[in-house]
């Protein structure tokens, strides 16, 4: 059963019970962030994505998690992985220096994207300001399913 879940198409599932939301994020496989690969493999749909890089010690490090609207995953990933287009100097430096990777998950719901991004941001950078959730639930819980077994929470 667990192996079958890891091979599921990238998407976000949600169950709601007693004012609490339980999300399951099914990630795409981790792929090298090259523009032609992104154009071939990333759909032009709404969703969330993570960017990673491989450091000098061959450890994978998270750069960011973000969201994209309709038509946006492909174009947003293309933009955010191109050092000539990225405005933030620290990102540009990482993109120029390291091999970068991405993974994504699809969800059409803007509110679900807000909740998932809020949860991840809260976990990744405790004590830092986080994006607002949708305000629909008292508590948000999340589980990740990754074909690469890369689980960050």
Features from the language model and the residues they span:
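Boundary/linker segments flanking structured domains
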Residues: 1-63, 67-153
